[in-house]
């Protein structure tokens, strides 16, 4: 099993460490050539946290947006954390256009406040159990479509969800020692292959 990690900007190295800890091979995807070379070998894709506007621009500049979108729509399992969640959203409240726009949800950017307003908590995540959650200016999922399953909420706000082959979290599971959400994603990848 090999999981690609979008490595244009953001917390990609931390995701690679977690996958390594779980005995799963990962590959950093920095451009279209990387993605096309590895696409047939990929069991899944991680879209890490970072700055979503910058990542969206880089995806467009590298001509990666459409090929990645097509792969996701064709069933490639994807895990978007924080900015990665924003990239997957069909609608972003403060923007006119979405990026990949594959997941039926409306997202509000930076809803968890400024960097100084970032926080840590623990909450139940369906299918995983009670897990630690680190929020860094995290987005909030304002609403989800019919086919989207809400996996976790904090303060009555949606912070994790799944729609078919797409898993998202507003928080950064890669910044804790708890690997269960990554294991949940790996299990999704195994089911698809």
From Swiss-Prot:
Keywords: Glutamine amidotransferase, Hydrolase, Lyase, Pyridoxal phosphate. GO terms for cellular component: cytosol; glutaminase complex. It comes from the Bacteria. One of its GO terms (biological process) is pyridoxal phosphate biosynthetic process. Catalyzes the hydrolysis of glutamine to glutamate and ammonia as part of the biosynthesis of pyridoxal 5'-phosphate. The resulting ammonia molecule is channeled to the active site of PdxS. Belongs to the glutaminase PdxT/SNO family. It comes from Streptococcus pneumoniae serotype 19F (strain G54). L-glutamine binds at residues 50-52, 109, 136-137. GO terms for molecular function: glutaminase activity; pyridoxal 5'-phosphate synthase (glutamine hydrolysing) activity. NCBIfam families: PLP_synth_Pdx2. Its EC number is 4.3.3.6, 3.5.1.2. Coiled coil: none annotated. Gene3D superfamilies: 3.40.50.880. Signal peptide: none annotated. This is Pyridoxal 5'-phosphate synthase subunit PdxT. Pathway: Cofactor biosynthesis; pyridoxal 5'-phosphate biosynthesis. In the presence of PdxS, forms a dodecamer of heterodimers. Only shows activity in the heterodimer. The active site is at residues 82, 172, 174. CDD domains: GATase1_PB (cd01749). It catalyses: aldehydo-D-ribose 5-phosphate + D-glyceraldehyde 3-phosphate + L-glutamine = pyridoxal 5'-phosphate + L-glutamate + phosphate + 3 H2O + H(+); L-glutamine + H2O = L-glutamate + NH4(+).
């Amino acid at each position: 099993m090999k999981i690609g990690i979008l490595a244009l900007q953001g917390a990609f190295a931390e995701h690679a460490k977690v996958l390594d800890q779980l005995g799963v091979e990962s590959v950093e995807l920095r451009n279209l050539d990387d993605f096309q070379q590895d696409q047939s070998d990929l069991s899944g894709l991680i879209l890490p946290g970072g700055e979503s506007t910058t990542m969206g621009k880089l995806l467009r500049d590298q001509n990666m947006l459409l090929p990645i979108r097509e792969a996701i729509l064709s069933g490639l399992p994807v895990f978007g954390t924080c900015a990665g969640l924003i990239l997957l959203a069909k609608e972003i409240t403060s923007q006119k256009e979405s990026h990949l726009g594959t997941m039926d949800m409306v997202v509000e950017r930076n809803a968890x406040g400024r960097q100084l307003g970032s926080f840590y908590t623990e909450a139940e995540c369906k299918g995983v159990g009670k897990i630690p959650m680190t929020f860094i200016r995290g987005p909030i999922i304002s609403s989800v479509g019919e086919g989207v399953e809400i996996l976790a909420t904090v303060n009555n706000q949606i912070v994790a969800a799944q729609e078919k082959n797409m898993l998202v979290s507003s928080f950064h599971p890669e910044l804790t020692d708890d690997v269960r959400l990554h294991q949940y994603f790996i299990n999704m990848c195994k089911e698809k292959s």
